């Protein structure tokens, strides 16, 4: 089961978060609500390793709370939501940063961009260096710089989040590691001929072993689908390969005086392989709102 990103929606007491939650419908997120109060800091301290991103409605309490988080070395991806004026000031004036230099701001009027902004906040957080973790505003002289423990937590949090994103994105990172020069259409005529012969031979082995149990069929199918995926082979090419092989088998059965009906069972093999390949291609299609820097960061 693919892990969901754990979001904590932080609001002032009495705030109705319905419009915000409506922008986060789907299977990407697990959303929990949290309001400012005496237990706010204690809760974040106790659960900091389970939080993937904070979505914070700006309020009067923001500055004090997030200064405490910064001084405690609790650094998490964060999106601040607020009115236009507050967002514009915070984005343009570094001194207005409340938490750290990777925080993001979003105007309430643009809530439809919330999912994108969360992705951007996570991407910037993954690029956050331990030495640049805190905001660039002057530090309180009564507090020392973040110690090695705080820096270690940041690195741990980045690694944990990157692993979850790698799982969440599935084959997406692998997709961008494919080398186009190895695509079937990019091969020379001789290489294409060699590829076709090996491709048909592998498919024949899978078909013949599918119902016999002689070979580890699941492993063979996985290897075959990987071969097709990295060669950018289309589903129609696999279908064509299957039909040619079935014609060959049909002729052999006809010569032996046997019924061709058994060949209908081999459609299960085709369905199994096509389903595997389609799932790989489906999961490798990047969402339009996914920052490319996020892809490169988790490679």
Curated annotation (Swiss-Prot):
The Gene Ontology biological process annotation of the record reads: circadian rhythm
Q: Which top-rank group of organisms is this from?
A: Bacteria
Q: Which residues form the KaiA C-terminal domain?
A: 179-287
Start and end of every KaiA N-terminal domain? 1-169
For the region PsR domain, binds oxidized quinones, give the residue spans.
3-135
Q: Which UniProt keywords apply?
A: Biological rhythms
Pfam families noted in UniProt: KaiA (PF07688), KaiA_N (PF21714)
Record-linked InterPro entries? CheY-like_superfamily, Circadian_clock_KaiA, Circadian_clock_KaiA_N, Circadian_clock_protein_KaiA_C, KaiA/RbsU_helical_domain_sf
* Function of the molecule: Key component of the KaiABC oscillator complex, which constitutes the main circadian regulator in cyanobacteria. Complex composition changes during the circadian cycle to control KaiC phosphorylation. KaiA stimulates KaiC autophosphorylation, while KaiB sequesters KaiA, leading to KaiC autodephosphorylation. KaiA binding to the KaiC CII domain during the subjective day yields KaiA(2-4):KaiC(6) complexes which stimulate KaiC autophosphorylation. Binds oxidized quinones via the N-terminal PsR domain, allowing it to sense redox changes and possibly mediate clock input.
Q: Please quote what the entry notes about the protein's domains.
A: The N-terminal pseudoreceiver domain (PsR, approximately equal to KaiA N-terminal) binds oxidized quinones. The KaiA C-terminal domain mediates interaction with KaiC, homodimerization, and is responsible for the clock oscillation function.
The protein in question is named Circadian clock oscillator protein KaiA
